[in-house]
Structures are given as C-alpha cells and as structure tokens.
C-alpha cells in the first residue's frame, strides 16, 4: 500500500500525532472501559476497499473487514472467510468455498455474491484498487471492466478464472481490496463509504463514530465468528497532526499504542519506554518519486539526472544520524523481509553514495539541457519527515551544487491529493508497506503502466511484460527470477529513488498488554488487552 502510508511511508507503519487540539483528546470511547487507542490519520477517501490505498484508511478497514484469507503475524496466509481455495491443474482457475456461518455487522450473511459484486464494483467503477484485479478474465491490463471470470456456483461457492496461471493467487487474497461488501453497501456505495459495514472483528461504534480529522471509533462486532475475535472493548484511531504530539500522549499513557516515533526521540525512546517498545524490520521501503511530467526528468536527460540525484544521497550517514540506525540503506525497490530478496541486484550501485559519479552524470545531463531552478522534495508535515527530507535535500545540494529543499504539505491527505491531480512541482516522498508478502506486490502496483499507485506516471513496456510474466509463473523461483530482472530496469530508469528500509519503531502505554507487531509493521490490535 502506498504509504500509501502517512508514516511508513516512513508506509505505513509509522506515525501520527496531534497536540491537544483537533484529534488530540484520547479519552476512551466505545462499548466499555477496555477500549484501546492507537494513532491514525484522516482517510483520504470514503472507507470502501476499492477506494482505499493509503495507510490512514487502510488501518481502519483492516479491523472492519475480513477477507478469504488472513495473514499470520509472520505473513503466512491462512484461510479465513474461505473454507477452501483450490486450483485446477495449472492454477488458472480456482474454486472458492466459503464458511456458511460468517456475517456482516448488520447481521446479513457473507455469501459468494458479496465477493463477486464487490470486486466488480471496483473494476466497473475504475476505483483505485482496480489494478489488483487485472489478473482476472474480463478486465483490461489496468484491472478495469467486468470480471467475466467470476461465477457463482451456489450461495457459498464461486469460481475465479484468471487470464494466466497464477500459483500465488490464494496468498494475495488477504489484502483488503479483496474484501466482500454487504448488500446495503452494494446498493448505496456512497453511504457505505461513510458508514462502512464490514465482516471483521470490529464495527463502527455508532453512526457518528467517524469524527473527521479527529478520530474513528470501533467496538467488537458481535456477529463475528472468525479466529481474530477482539480481546478488548474496541479500538479508537486517533488522528494526529504531528508525531511529537502522539509520542507525548503515549509518554503520559493517554495513548495506548503508537506505531512510529518522531525523529527527535530515536535515540531515547527505548529507554524512556523501557520494556514497552518495538524496533524491528518489516515489509516496507521508503523512496522519493520524481514524476515523469517534470521538466528535465524525461528521456535520456531525465535518466541521467535521476541517477545523479540517487548517487548524491548519503544514505549511510542519514540513516545513522537522523534515524539512529532504525533504518537500513536500500539496495532495491522491495524489502529484505520478503522471500526472494536480493541485496546484490545488477545495477544497484546507483543506490550507493558516489559524489564524483553523481557530478559526472549531472554534467552530462546539463549538456543536453542546462538545469535551472530548485529541486524540491514534497512531504506531509504530520508524518515526522522534515528531518530526513532536509538532510536528503542538503546531501543533494552539497554534492551537485544546486538548490535543493523540502516542500512541506500540511497533512498526508493534502500531499496525496496533489499527487493524484498531478500538481506536484518537484519530487515527493512516498513508500510502500506490503499489501501481501511478495516481491510482486512492491513492483507492479507502483510501477506498472497505469497502476493507481504509479503517481509518477512511469511507463516501460518491457517492465510491464515482465510483470505479466512474473504473475503467471508456476513456481516462486521463476517469479523471483523475473522480478529481479524487472528491478534492473527500474534501477536504470529510477522512477522512484529507493532510500532505506524502515524498522517499525513504536511503543505502548502502561495500560495495555499483549502488544505485538506483524510482518508489515502494524500492531495486532485484536490481541491487545487493557489492564
């Protein structure tokens, strides 16, 4: 998801905060006194699975909905709403049988048509998550159109025909884009987006539980019968405008869980919150994207400038001094926690600080068209990004001898809206937190032609072909080989500049127990208990 993520993006796993103003109050609200509070951000869009591809909305949908499979804490896919998911001989057609006892929070049953119609809503309306359905028969290369490959066999069974054999199809189905929708939302998606009705372990606490720019309150879903039943009285997502304020609330035990701490406490948070912290790698990576539509950044000139800028960033120094070792310099576009990761991909020397080579490449670009102006990196001020953006801009400035600086946006939503409208006047920070644990998920949604998370409008036909080939691979080894070949193309073109792999660096209050963080750096909220 595109950190998609306000912080992870320092994606997704990272951080939210607000002083004691809008959203600053963290008093418990819900059905009881055992409500867990955690940080969040105001969702960019209505809370529908097809419209949500950023962390603010994604966190909330994760507790409101359950999919055909779910992911264990280590990222292993296990059956959830599905009783069985079976492929044919070449994995081009799958039969999905549902448990017959699952219900939405409004009491209606979760049936085959709730999946089929929900997925078709996404593709027929060309919603943001349509790209995840491009593998199905009937959709175009961008996942739009009617999914003719879905057939209802009976109330609790349906089949899915894919364009090509897809051996990892089942493991993808835990992503929230593949969630079902109740009949009420299918009949009125606008209403469902403002007052989501899901089939997960939690539900909206009330019709006004979404207090925009303040918080979103959930309570346990009494109709839920799956394996992730809430061990608390609900979860309230508090929308912060700064990481520092979130950390202040956490330190005073006014907030229960913060999944990202501000740069100002990287050196001290583990001692200040002794025994109540997490600092571990997860499936995420941070970049900054340089849009194709910017002057000086297309064609051969653009390729030279992108490589020069990448080599002008001193990742080692920044990760040590700004992040105090809670980040690791990136060697590719994915994450080292994923199967098939390779730190030695051909061409990744472009991700190593090399000031002399950077100057040489910049001079070659100037010979094509002289540079003028200021190189900027856009970022959201509510995500704790200023320190590293300033350090990165200074590294570029000092190496290349050009003006470079950060370009702050008030909040994550404002930044995303500008990206969506193609209104960026410079580069912009972004990142990725795995939707499901696979290399493919880090590459196709962000860099395939027309993909919704491809906010820089990158397009390379050879890369697109390799994505199709990787998706159709019959073994993981074959898929990995193809995906690493695709990464060599990205390392030449640098549609985004990989910076570092983040740790989830967070903490929890003295008021909660059983706090764990999963494979993508998110707290496992249903397990958390209040003292």
Residues covered by each model-derived region:
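Structural transition elements
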Residues: 328-365, 383-387
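Gly/Pro-rich hinge or "lid" segments in bacterial periplasmic/extracellular proteins
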Residues: 166-229, 234
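Surface-exposed binding/hinge segments that line
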Residues: 97, 131-183
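Ligand/substrate-recognition segments at binding pockets and active sites
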Residues: 363-434
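N-terminal lobe/hinge region of extracytoplasmic solute-binding protein
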Residues: 39-89, 197
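Detector for C-terminal structural segments
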Residues: 31, 313-340, 384-394, 417-531
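Ligand-site clamp/hinge motif
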Residues: 190, 196, 222-268
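Alpha-helical secondary-structure segments
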Residues: 111-120, 155-161, 201, 232-234, ...
């Amino acid at each position: 998801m595109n950190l998609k993520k306000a912080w992870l993006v320092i994606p997704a796993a990272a951080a939210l905060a607000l002083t004691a103003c809008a959203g600053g109050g963290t008093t418990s609200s819900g059905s009881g006194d055992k409500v867990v509070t955690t940080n969040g951000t105001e969702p960019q869009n209505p809370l529908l699975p097809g419209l949500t591809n950023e962390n603010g909305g994604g966190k909330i949908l994760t507790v409101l909905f359950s999919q055909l499979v779910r992911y264990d804490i280590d990222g292993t896919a296990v059956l959830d709403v599905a009783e069985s998911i079976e492929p044919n001989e070449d994995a081009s057609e799958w039969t999905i049988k549902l448990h017959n006892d699952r219900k939405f929070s409004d009491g209606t049953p979760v049936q085959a048509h709730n999946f089929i119609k929900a997925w078709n809503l996404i593709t027929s309306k060309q919603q943001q998550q349509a790209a995840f359905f491009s593998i199905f028969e009937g959709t175009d290369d961008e996942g739009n159109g009617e999914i003719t490959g879905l057939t209802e066999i009976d109330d609790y069974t349906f089949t899915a025909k894919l364009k090509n054999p897809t051996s990892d199809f089942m493991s993808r189905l835990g992503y929230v884009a593949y969630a079902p929708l109740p009949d009420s939302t299918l009949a009125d998606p606008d209403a469902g987006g403002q007052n989501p009705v899901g089939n997960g372990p939690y539900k909206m606490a009330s019709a006004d539980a979404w207090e925009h720019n303040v918080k979103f309150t959930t309570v346990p879903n009494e109709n839920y019968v799956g394996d992730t039943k809430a061990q608390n009285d609900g979860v309230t997502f508090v929308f912060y405008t700064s990481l520092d304020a979130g950390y202040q609330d956490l330190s005073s035990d006014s907030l229960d869980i913060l999944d990202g701490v501000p740069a100002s406490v990287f050196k001290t948070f583990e001692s200040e919150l002794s025994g109540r912290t997490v600092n571990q790698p997860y499936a995420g990576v941070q970049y900054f994207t340089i849009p194709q539509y910017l002057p000086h950044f297309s064609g051969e000139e653009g390729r030279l400038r992108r490589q020069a800028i990448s080599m002008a960033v001193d990742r080692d120094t920044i990760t040590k001094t700004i992040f105090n070792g809670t980040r690791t310099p990136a060697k590719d576009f994915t994450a080292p926690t994923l199967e098939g990761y390779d730190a030695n991909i051909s061409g990744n020397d472009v991700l190593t600080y090399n000031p002399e080579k950077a100057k040489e490449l910049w001079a070659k670009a100037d010979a094509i068209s002289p540079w003028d102006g200021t190189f900027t990196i856009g970022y959201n001020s509510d995500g704790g990004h200023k320190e590293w953006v300033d350090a990165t801009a200074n590294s570029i400035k000092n190496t290349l001898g050009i003006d470079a600086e950060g370009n702050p946006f008030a909040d994550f939503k404002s930044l995303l809206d500008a990206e969506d409208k193609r209104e960026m006047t410079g580069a912009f920070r972004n990142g990725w937190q795995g939707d499901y644990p696979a290399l493919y998920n880090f590459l196709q949604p962000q860099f395939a032609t027309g993909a919704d998370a491809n906010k820089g409008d990158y397009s390379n036909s050879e890369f697109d072909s390799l994505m199709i080939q990787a998706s159709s691979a019959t073994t993981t080894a074959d898929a990995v080989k193809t995906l690493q070949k695709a990464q060599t193309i990205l390392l030449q073109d640098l549609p985004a500049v990989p910076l570092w792999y983040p740790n989830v660096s967070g903490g929890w209050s003295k008021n909660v127990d059983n706090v764990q963080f999963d494979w993508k750096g998110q707290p496992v909220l249903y397990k958390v208990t209040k003292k």
